[in-house]
Design a protein with these regions (language model features):
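Peripheral, non-catalytic segments flanking oxidoreductase cores
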Residues: 1-247
Length: 247
């Protein structure tokens, strides 16, 4: 345990299904009793995580007019300025919440122009918007996304086993899967009621993988109304279940 947030070592997954069975029970406890976990030995290189954080800094260090030129498109890809979003519909949100004090750059799975979903103009499968003034930004971010996506897929058999399902159960739902990757910047703000970097919320997706930094601020609710700080664990990811898996 790490301050009551389960800490799970994914090293056994290197042994395939035998390893998945080793961590299934711990995964079941984490997801059914807490809803969050911290994973280590996940296979995502520490230097790749550090480089991706640096790419996020490079992006947000650009002048505001440059970022506005990359504003979000109809697929929710691109730049979202600070104060343009707040949470009002989540079951854990607050009535007095103000617009989030963060800016962010969003992207989704990179697909070629001849991809069937792109040709069909499927919502959220459309083009990403890439900055042109940041050499190697696109390549490094895609590399990171590919590695994290592969890590998440390695976790699926253990997740299925933790729910007493066949180990390949979730594969059918991820044959043509989607993800959303967010590079956020949280500027310093004054303490004020209803003002958050990002307001209390639940994620609508299947699972979220958040690489930890040594800057505090992230809190989770393990029980209704009971919030706690997430402890920093070097070279780890915080994982939370989304509304899709919850259902």
């Amino acid at each position: 345990m790490s301050d009551d947030i389960p800490l799970i070592d994914l090293a056994p997954l290197r042994d395939g299904l035998d390893g998945a069975r080793q961590i299934a029970s711990a995964l079941n406890h984490a997801l059914e009793n807490v809803g969050f976990l911290i994973i280590v030995n996940h296979g995502v290189p520490a230097d790749l995580i550090a480089q991706t954080f640096e790419e996020a800094r490079r992006f947000h260090d650009q002048p505001l007019d440059v970022k506005h030129a990359l504003r979000m498109n109809e697929h929710n890809n691109g730049y979202m300025a600070e104060g343009r979003y707040n949470v009002r519909t989540s079951r854990v949100s607050e009535k007095s919440v103000q617009p989030d004090a963060n800016e962010a750059f969003f992207l989704k799975r990179e697909r070629p122009a001849d991809n069937p979903l792109v040709l069909a103009e499927r919502r959220f499968a459309g083009p990403n918007i890439w900055p042109t003034r940041l050499p190697a930004f696109r390549e490094k971010v895609i590399e990171y996304c590919d590695v994290v996506d592969a890590m998440a897929r390695r976790l699926l058999p253990a997740l299925a086993l933790s729910l007493d399902l066949e180990p390949d159960y979730f594969e059918q739902f991820f044959a043509e899967s989607q993800y959303s990757f967010r590079l956020s910047h949280y500027p310093p703000v004054a303490r004020k009621e209803g003002l958050y970097g990002i307001a209390p919320h639940t994620d609508m997706n299947f699972m979220t993988f958040l690489p930890q930094s040594d800057v505090p601020g992230l809190q989770i609710a393990t029980e209704p109304g009971k919030w706690r700080d997430v402890p920093y664990v070097a070279n780890s990811f915080v994982v939370n279940t989304g509304d899709t898996l919850h259902r």
